[in-house]
Amino acid sequence: MESLTLQPIARVDGTINLPGSKSVSNRALLLAALAHGKTVLTNLLDSDDVRHMLNALAALGVSYTLSADRTRCEIIGNGGPLHAEGALELFLGNAGTAMRPLAAALCLGSNDIVLTGEPRMKERPIGHLVDALRLGGAKITYLEQENYPPLRLQGGFTGGNVEVDGSVSSQFLTALLMTAPLAPEDTVIRIKGDLVSKPYIDITLNLMKTFGVEIENQHYQQFVVKGGQSYQSPGTYLVEGDASSASYFLAAAAIKGGTVKVTGIGRNSMQGDIRFADVLEKMGATICWGDDYISCTRGELNAIDMDMNHIPDAAMTIATAALFAKGTTTLRNIYNWRVKETDRLFAMATELRKVGAEVEEGHDYIRITPPEKLNFAEIATYNDHRMAMCFSLVALSDTAVTILDPKCTAKTFPDYFEQLARISQPG
């Protein structure tokens, strides 16, 4: 297996221009495909997940052109639901941001489409979304294991009263929200359980509004969506920088700054993960906010005990930053780490122990006490981009670290390690 050894980093300083947000890129691509008119997306993320969405749209007959660096995309909207000519199978890798929204959108009208993916995708639950779509009339068949992909979709979603469990993934609600305006009838979506990752729903609602559709949000407990609507192209749309990707550089600055400035997001960003900066500030770093940037300057870091439900992806970065904080850090309400690219709670606990931390792994929390000195370790990444990027922070000590399968960062940030090296001074 390929590996990358990072030598100790003495200091980080500089500016990082963030790649486009994965969450925003794939939502914007789908809405542009469903819309009337031509949409030009700029600062689009070029990553595995986005390529899976683009390949699926091409297979569904959507016409688009990409710039040479794949960050500018012109899409000719379909002006309504997507249809396949005859039976079709779409392979979506391990891209939840493609699987979930397409599973809903392709239930409009009459289709016969199979959605499948990598082995890990077949372990990521989708039953709550399927249950909700079936309540709205969709015909969906599980082809292997009940409640998991692959799925066969045969259209039939017309709207009506549906309910969806919000406790596992907000992507199920996102998928329903983006699909419902194109259904023939009005849709009322009721949320069962506690809605996780609420800020990701705000991204969805914000993008739908950009494409001309507004819905009634009743305190995140119920959403009322008028049927028979259509999306309209906004013309040109700039994809924000990825706030989850920003977390690694901001944390690096908190640990071994200097000052690091990330551009492409700022105080008015629609992504909830910008709140990660507030957590670093609470730990002792100095944060400065602009309209188009966030900067972080080193501070003496102290442990925290916090509910991280609102920023589950960026919270992983706090788990490795905790290695450099004084005291024991507890991250709570993070059950949905278990249903991501890998079981992130198990993976994080296992690898933190390798570098010498004392770790308590709970059902939905993790407690981390750093060692006096970090151990050298080979870090398994579980084919999970965030594990690779989080554990790069170990090199901000006086200990090297080896990252196995470093190219798994291609899911969201193909040149992550080059960008980290650019702002790093060796120890």
Curated annotation (Swiss-Prot):
Enzyme class: transferase
Positions annotated to bind 3-phosphoshikimate: 22-23, 27, 169-171, 197, 313, 336, 340
Keywords noted in UniProt: Amino-acid biosynthesis, Aromatic amino acid biosynthesis, Cytoplasm, Transferase
One GO location term (cellular component): cytoplasm
CDD domains referenced in this protein's UniProt entry, alphabetically: EPT-like (cd01554)
Catalytic residues, chain numbering: 313
Cellular location(s): Cytoplasm
Pfam families to which the protein is assigned, alphabetical: EPSP_synthase
Domain of life: Bacteria
Pathway in which this enzyme or protein is active: Metabolic intermediate biosynthesis; chorismate biosynthesis; chorismate from D-erythrose 4-phosphate and phosphoenolpyruvate: step 6/7
Residues annotated to bind phosphoenolpyruvate: 22, 96, 124, 171, 344, 386, 411
Keyword Amino-acid biosynthesis: yes
EC number assigned by the record: 2.5.1.19
Biological process terms in GO annotation: amino acid biosynthetic process; aromatic amino acid family biosynthetic process; chorismate biosynthetic process
GO molecular function: 3-phosphoshikimate 1-carboxyvinyltransferase activity
UniProt catalytic activity: 3-phosphoshikimate + phosphoenolpyruvate = 5-O-(1-carboxyvinyl)-3-phosphoshikimate + phosphate
Subunit: Monomer.
Matching PANTHER family: AROM/DEHYDROQUINATE SYNTHASE, PENTAFUNCTIONAL AROM POLYPEPTIDE
Family statement drawn from the similarity comment of this UniProt entry: Belongs to the EPSP synthase family.
Role noted for this protein: Catalyzes the transfer of the enolpyruvyl moiety of phosphoenolpyruvate (PEP) to the 5-hydroxyl of shikimate-3-phosphate (S3P) to produce enolpyruvyl shikimate-3-phosphate and inorganic phosphate.
Listed name of the protein: 3-phosphoshikimate 1-carboxyvinyltransferase
Biological classification of the source: Bacteria, Pseudomonadati, Pseudomonadota, Gammaproteobacteria, Enterobacterales
